[in-house]
């Protein structure tokens, strides 16, 4: 069996400091993310494309878990498939070691680039320059979070001509151990544009909000030195954003101040949220939390009393007021 044709361009990449690993792909097919990307946040990732053998994804991850190198894995995959020259596959382990194979029966232009920390591969491309521009964009944005670097790489590919047939779907998946929503799983970012006339633009639009609604909150929850630069980058990005909602500012402010990190930024964001939604008692509670975390108990009390004035029967606000009064009297 030849399997389905998934001509595409992809990047597999890892951040060896934060321990994030991800894949981004775009193609003129429906739902490129359905078959191409396979990721295990503890071991590595596999991208299987062209005349895709989807078995390579699961088997590749199993072999990574067993400690095989990316080259050894591709050699094993080759030995198991009589139609291997139709395939294109890339493997990257969590340490940034990668390897790729492009069969000589792939539709041109087809090729790959491998280096420490990333594997870039594509087939049915307008030219070799598509891959070169992907690499250039990825390397020139090293100060940004991995997900954003992957998206910028895909955008560069599209600008360089991308898939010769056109565009339809894109996917970006980034995993980090316990980096998913509330730590339930590992999906830090999972954005799928399955059928669109402008998949890159849609991907960027959704990511713009995703990075604050989900990714930054996960970074804050996991908060450690390895993630600090990403947290600072995203907080600064939020400061200059002009179209975020009150909820976005409030959610981040609460996470920061309840964990006693970057409390000054948290206070700034909570006040922005209040300006956007001045009668929201929950935002007033967040402002109080930020003042409390900064040791300004009188202002915390002031904002809690404002919140209670709006929701006069709120027992939570009443208990918080008594708590803050106790701190003032200590």
Show where each model-derived region lies.
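Charged, low-complexity interaction regions
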Residues: 226-228, 313-314
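Register position in tetratricopeptide repeats
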Residues: 258-259, 293, 323-327
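Alpha-helical adaptor scaffolds
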Residues: 220-225, 235, 239-290
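N-terminal nucleophile
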Residues: 6-223
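TPR/TPR-like (Sel1-like) alpha-helical repeat modules
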Residues: 292, 297-315, 322
């Amino acid at each position: 069996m030849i399997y389905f044709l998934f001509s595409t361009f992809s990047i597999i990449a890892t951040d060896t400091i934060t321990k994030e690993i991800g894949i981004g792909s775009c193609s003129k097919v429906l739902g490129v993310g359905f078959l191409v990307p396979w990721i295990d946040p503890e071991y590595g990732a596999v991208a299987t494309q062209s005349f895709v053998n989807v078995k390579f994804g699961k088997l590749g991850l199993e072999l990574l878990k067993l400690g095989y190198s990316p080259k050894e894995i591709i050699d094993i995959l080759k030995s198991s498939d009589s139609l291997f020259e139709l395939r294109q596959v890339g493997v990257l382990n969590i340490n940034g070691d990668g390897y790729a194979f492009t069969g000589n029966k792939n539709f041109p232009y087809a090729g790959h680039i491998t280096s420490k920390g990333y594997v870039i591969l594509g087939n049915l491309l307008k030219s070799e320059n598509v891959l070169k521009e992907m690499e250039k964009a990825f390397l020139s944005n090293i100060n940004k979070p991995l997900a954003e670097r992957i998206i910028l790489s895909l955008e560069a590919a599209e600008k360089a001509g991308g898939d010769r047939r056109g565009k339809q779907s894109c996917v970006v998946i980034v995993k980090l151990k316990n980096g998913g929503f509330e730590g339930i799983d590992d999906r830090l970012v999972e954005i799928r544009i399955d059928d669109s006339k402008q998949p890159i633009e849609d991907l960027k639009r959704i990511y713009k909000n995703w990075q604050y609604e989900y990714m930054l909150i996960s970074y804050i929850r996991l908060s450690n030195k390895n993630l600090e630069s990403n947290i600072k980058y995203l907080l600064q990005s939020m400061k200059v954003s002009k179209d975020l909602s009150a909820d976005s500012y409030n959610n981040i402010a609460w996470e920061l101040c309840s964990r006693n990190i970057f409390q000054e930024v948290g206070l700034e964001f909570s006040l922005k949220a209040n300006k956007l939604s001045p009668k929201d008692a929950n935002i007033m509670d967040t402002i109080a939390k930020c003042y409390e975390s900064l040791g300004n108990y009188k202002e915390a009390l002031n904002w809690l009393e404002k919140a209670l004035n709006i929701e006069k029967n709120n027992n939570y606000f009443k208990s918080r007021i008594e708590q803050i009064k106790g701190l003032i009297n200590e």
